[in-house]
Amino acid sequence: MVVLLCNDRIRLTVLPAFLCTMKKNDIFEDTKKKSDASVYRKKSKTLLIALIVLACAVVFFLAFLFAYRKIKNYLYTSSSVFSLTEKWKAYDYEAVYEISSHMLERKPFSNTALTYHGYSSFYLAVSQTDTSLSQGYLDEAVNCMRLALFSAKKSLVPQLQYMLGKAYFYKNTVTSFYYADLALKYLSLAKDNGYKANDIPEYMGLSYAALGKPMESISSFTEALLLRESDSLLISIAEQYYKVGQTSAAKQYLYRIKKESSDELLVLRAMGLLGAIYTDEKNFSDAKAEFEEILRKNKNSADAYYGLGVLYEKQGDMVKARSEWRKALKLQVNHSGSLSKLSEYAK
């Protein structure tokens, strides 16, 4: 009995302790589970927030990309002034020409479109090697710029007049009609209205020369020399001095070209004019030397053969004179000087 009682007591003592230990373990496990659940919820919440932020970022990026493309397409559309000015800054005259054409289809009297179309047409014209294409572009340039003048801002008018004057100047060089008077009109207006461009006096000088006004031409060329000197300008002045009989002044410019110019074509042109001056002065030996030197450098110079013909004519040797003029016509069938001389002596 004692043993049993002792065992029972031991069992009774051990049981509560065991139950207490179990309870503590359960509480610990519950706490751990709750802690794990809390951590899981926090992680889930963080992940959810991250996903939401990422989704918002993706949506924002796509919206930005869409808006950017829309804006870019708008800015660079064929009828956009922004695109027009950007192409102009890049000297892309063909693109400016096309864009302004599209703009004029929608708004035929848009001053901006007319101005840019006129300007781009002009620059395309002067870059052409085909005369017929050049004429077409110049016609467009003139028409657009004249229309633009009617509605242009006051500050833009002198520039339009300057460009219009240049367009008429080039029309005068590529067509059989005379436009030098209109070139002078608009270049003079641009100058009087305060537009500054170093080439205005030279263009005016060439226009006066085309109209047969050598003194006015010399005046403009002299003004041009003060702004910028060039070999082409020097020979243009020399030619005008020759036309008014001031051969001494002409020779000074021609000597400079022969001595200093690196442009072989201008040097040959200067030698030809010197040969003509020497012929007029009856300095036949120097004249012949100039013409023969030209032919050594360019055996196909019709002008040199013509000059030799005139030299022989003045010496009274008409057989040689006719021979030289015929040589000139073989090289250039429409050489006006040779045709005139042979026609004169055929009578």
Features from the language model and the residues they span:
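Residue-level recognition of tetratricopeptide repeat
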Residues: 85, 119, 123-126, 166, ...
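Register position in tetratricopeptide repeats
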Residues: 123, 170, 210, 243-244, ...
